[in-house]
Amino acid sequence: MRISDIAKRARANLASVFKNPAGTYRQLKRVVRAVLGYARGMLDYPAAWFGLSRPRDELAASVAELLIVGFYGSNTRSLSARLLARQIHRGEIGGVFFVNQNIGSIKDVKKLLRLFRAGPNQPLIAVDHEGGIVQRLNKSHGFTQLPAAKRVAARMSPDEAQKLYTIAGQELAALGFNINLGPVLDFDNPENPAIGKARRSYGVDPERITAYGEAFTRGFASAGVLCAAKHFPGHGNSVTDSHHGVADISTSWTTAELEPFARLFASPHTPAMVMIGHLRHDSLSPDEQLATVSAPIVTGLLREKLGYQGAVMTGDIDMDAVSQLMSRKHAIIQALAAGNDLVMIKNLFGYDPLLPQHVVRWVREAISQGVLTDAQIKAAAARVRAIRQRIGPGQADP
């Protein structure tokens, strides 16, 4: 992103503050943080661009598989997008994810996807494409507008939903995306700010949630787009939104919220990935850690008790729920130690052009200190490579 683009966005957000001070103050504060962090990060940009002193051993290659990273801007003029593409091409980073601010015109999206896919290493390219208000590519981009999950469950059978999701998957795959960050398997609670109020849940009956979750997974997978079921172990009954702080489910969560995950894992269409929510549950995690960095939840509950064998991914660790509690370094290392395979890092607040080099160094330190093992990193990388093999070369438009 150019400095002029940052200034333009900052002015737009400043104008919105005067229209709605209470609703946009937080957004403005985030923009200021992003601008300052970007400016500081640019000091390391030349070293990152030329790959000075970048590690090239087997451990570094494994760590690269585990990183799925965001970028600034919505077109190929973005300096961070260009650097991220270069790091993907050199094998320093394994994936990229798009959020709202990365989606401009369909022409710009196509150019960005070509930029990321241009090298020898084909990245994981992820986007939220649930439907309703969580659909980054919509009718304005020539995409089928998907209803929110709650409406799908109310008006369609699972078979009808699967046909709709298949069409949506074909549209994503044709553009070049290969990962959809969905389906949502959380329970519906109308008071929940993150799930219920946005109508992102299929209901409260585990069997019904599973049926539509399977339709979602099966439809997108049939088009070559793999899915990440979320938000384990269940975000639906929280009273806060993890985008803006810790979502404590210690007193509101019930074991029934595990059932949609367990049922989908036992189906013929197990999702390739599961996303861990930035959720706190003091009984499930006696060390009072967020689920994202909790070995009892990621390894003990998800892996061992429910038997999930696919790849486990974090939500964006730069979200407030995590960043307010720990440094990026601590979050990455603890997430990997807990059993996650993919770590999502927006790299927006505190932009770090040398992120891949830093993560490799942090992992080496953690291995030397006994926090991680070389075998853990290799096993996680192997699960991510298995996902790549299922995706194939893709069908992006020229």
Predicted features and spans:
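Mid-to-C-terminal alpha-helical segments outside catalytic/metal-binding sites
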Residues: 361, 367-397
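Membrane-proximal basic amphipathic "stem/tether" segments
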Residues: 1-52
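Glycine-rich anion/phosphate-binding loops
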Residues: 104-109, 154-167, 207-210
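Active-site mouth loops of central-metabolism enzymes
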Residues: 68-79, 150-159, 245-254, 318-325
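Short, acidic/polar
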Residues: 76-88, 164-168, 258-260, 328-332
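Glycine-rich, aromatic-flanked loop segments that form ligand/cofactor-binding clefts
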Residues: 117-144, 161-188, 209-233
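N-terminal hydrophobic targeting/anchoring segments and the immediately downstream early-domain regions
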Residues: 31-141, 343-345
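Second-shell residues forming the walls of enzyme active-site clefts
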Residues: 96, 104-121, 208-367, 371-372
